[in-house]
Amino acid sequence: MKTSLQIIKFGGTSVGSGERIRHVANIIAHKLHDPGEAFPIVVVSAMSGVTDQLLRIARYACTGAHQDCEFELSALKQKHTEAAEKALHNHESRHSLLHDLETAFTSLTQDIHELQGTQTRELPLRTAAVAAWGERFSVLLVAAAAREIGIEAAHVYEEVIVTAYPQSETLQPLGTVIGADPLTEETRANVQRLIHPLIERRVVPVVPGFIGRTTTGFVTTLGRNGSDYSATVIGAALDCSEVSIYTDVDGVLSADPRIVANTRLLPQLSYAEAARLSWFGAKVLHPRTLIPIAHRNIPVRVRNTFRPHTRGTVVGPEKTQRSAAAAISVRHQLALITVENTDMFGAPENAGQVFALAARAGAAPVAICSSSGHHLSFMVEEQAASSVVALLQHDMGTWRVICQRGLAACACIGSGFSADPMSPARAIIALAHEHIPVITQGASEPGIILIIEDQDSERALRCLHRDLIAPVIPLVRHEARERKREAR
């Protein structure tokens, strides 16, 4: 009989210390021994802050700041040594883990030395090789902690599960990470070769998130915060029954709890709702996380590592019953670009031309606000606005280009928003009561988008949540609210 499988992925805060790594090992043990649970495959992030440390090390190595590089590397090694000493209590187990970490740091040092003499074109891949070590250190720690409490666990360390497209020729700023795209069939073959033999022996695989390897053999990465993405890529390749993302909140909340009091915990979301929330600024899921699993109807559950008994939020296929509202998120530092044909006549293909020019400038439209034969308005990241405007003015002939900066997109997401024709009016009235002007609005199935001044965004988030979300979603206790109360 085919074994039912699940992915359990732990983020950087979940493995942020030796004590937390022991706690993660106990969660793995519960999953393994509970007859109601599928067999677990563990995916881990780097310890909190480690990827940034590695990118600093890479930058120092490239710029010749050798003393700073050595200082950061020493601090990084100390961090993992301390985590190992607290995660493992058995002397022999700890000694073996420290030896494995020492070997890993020797390999990292070699990658740093190779980076120092790298030509400009090879910098992104050499930097990725350094940035990838955080997850590799984590799998050593988590697998060792699991073994110490009696779990048969093996780290998949030397080989990389996810195969990705080769990096493009486009140069990236120093200190950024590559966002490579996985190759489905090649990754599935890697899973069959590296993970299935462990599962057949009832050995729990512990694999690194974030990391890929190109078809040409270079280590690459799946983009900033890409461990969630790699978890669902591997989950799809294994045909898992569920992917659980363990983080430091109880699930997906109805708004940012740092700004809005009495946020609601959302028990479920559709794939479309979660994807739009992520696109418009919600931080719980990586924007690309749902791509590999949505067409397979594999649910994702967002759970709290530190309150593992809570059910969290399930993200899955479209709900049969539409909700009146789900959540509100804000994307900051945007610009509104309007392109107008001064003679009032335009061709349908002009929209395609505009977006092609925006893509050449390195900008993907965040939202489309209005479109007609002679008029098109869309939002882009503010930092890309000048390049987009320059290209449009150069290539669009008689078309007039207008740019308004300092804006934010306030996204009211939920299937009920798009089903209720009065939702936009209620949202605009709520903002009007707070004297917050709406610059323009757009549609984002499922939901509505309101463009406002960025300086008004926090007030807008509070009043929209108060008037649109709070009346229709019950208030329940969740961890974010309890932490806020304890901090008072």
Ranges and model annotations:
Residues 150-155, 244, 301-302, 310, ...:
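Proline-centered turn/helix-capping motifs that create local helix->coil transitions or kinks
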Residues 1-285, 290, 381, 451-453, ...:
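Nucleotide/pyrophosphate-binding catalytic subdomain
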